Amino acid sequence: MNPTLKNQARNVSPGTIIRGKWHHCKYRTVRLLGHGANGNVYLAESSNGRVAVKIGRESMSITSEVNVLKQFSRVQGNVLGPSLIDVDDWVTTDGTHPFYVMEYLRGQPLLSFIREKGEEWIGILTVQLLADLDRLHREGWVFGDLKPDNLLVSGPPPRVRWFDVGGTTLIGRSIKEYTEFFDRGYWGLGSRKAEPSYDLFAVAMIMLNSAYPKRFDRKKEGQRQLREALYESKALARYRRVITSALEGKYADAPSMRQDMVKAMSVPPSKPKRTSRTQSRKLKKQTKKSREWLQTFLFAAFLFVAYFLYLFGAH
């Protein structure tokens, strides 16, 4: 691709024809799918059906993302991300724009799927996501900008997939792209070093986001604020220990968090505590039952002793 490119990704209107400079393939845009720091992703029509086209801001970031997608394709049983289809440059009157074409993943946004299907899917999809992250981490990468906006639920059967790898970073380097709500640095709970625990923090925040779809800004000490939000959510009650451990960076790898998630899913949600009035009423009933049982026991004992004395006196 051309190394001398504009710094800004081009905004493309529906119906625009994107023609590759080198491979000469044509793509007609349908609508915007998403946007990020490195460029915009569009749904487009091609000679082979619908595809997703990402138009980048500069060549280096696009090359990096293409390398990640190629790496994904070498993972056995790959379901980590979309398949890479084409890489090219698009020449327009205002410059040359790098782009790549990938498989269009049909699905439903993660949060709307959970809202429609029910909160029990929070755990199921999180376990799936952690399994995929484990494979990504073992290949030497972290996702980086992990958030619901980059996740879809495809199927049936329902399967969580990610479609924008713009923030994917080699382990050991600095995270190159992030969103504040899902960034542990923003909450004062860790660095922006690319390591598995960075992604696992984001997984915990995705679970919080499922309970608080509108998200919220940091207004106090980060750990305290997140803990308060967690304990106010009934939907996340059974996952509190797992989420807390992920927020505090206690998981070194995805399998450890996944194992605890599976355990948490097997335990029924805790019942709400009874009010003091309810407890008092229950205590009175228990006291009354105990008194009645004692009276019955004493009467039975009296009959037994009386019968024994009767037999003893008969001889």
For every predicted segment, state its role.
Residues 1-22:
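Juxta-kinase regulatory segment immediately upstream of eukaryotic protein kinase catalytic domains
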Residues 5-8, 26, 30-31, 35-67:
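ATP-binding glycine-rich loop module of kinase domains
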Residues 82-98:
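Short beta-strand micro-motifs within the conserved protein kinase catalytic domain, predominantly
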Residues 125-126:
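Activation segment signature within eukaryotic-like protein kinase domains
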Residues 136-154:
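Catalytic-loop of the protein kinase fold
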Residues 161, 166-240:
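C-lobe/activation-segment region of protein kinase-like
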